[in-house]
Amino acid sequence: MMISNKAELDKCREAAVEELQSYGCRILVCSGTGCIATGSEKIYQKMMEIVGNTPNVTIEFAPHDEKEHVGVKRTGCQGFCEFGPLVRIQKGDKVVQYIKVQPDDCQEIFDNTVMGDGLVDRLLYKKAENTYVQPDEIPFIAKQTRVVLGKLRQI
């Protein structure tokens, strides 16, 4: 599709936002160089396997039926490389950031956070006496201002 003016671009953007909102949940696996070096591709493959083998859950680019739709996606750098591999779970307005995820953690993340409303506490970032669930609450990430690549963590 060729976009030739701003109105067409705005229409494409609105369609993309509507499509993203149709997912019940998005699993975002960091594929920045640091996370790839620490094994994020294995995390991605394991999540795809788990979602693909779960009854009444489907992975599709364009949801169109009554099943629960879960998107599994590689993203650009999520900005917290020291603690990779990183996985974010987006359900509506709720975002959970998991750190140092290993393939053996994927089923627990899927069962507790994707299919339920729970957390995997040991995979959350902790500093001093604080536990951080949402990525924007983590002090290091909260101080980052991404101007050009602001949406890289989501796309």
What role is predicted for each listed range?
Residues 1-155:
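Feature of Fe-S/electron-transfer and energy-metabolism proteins
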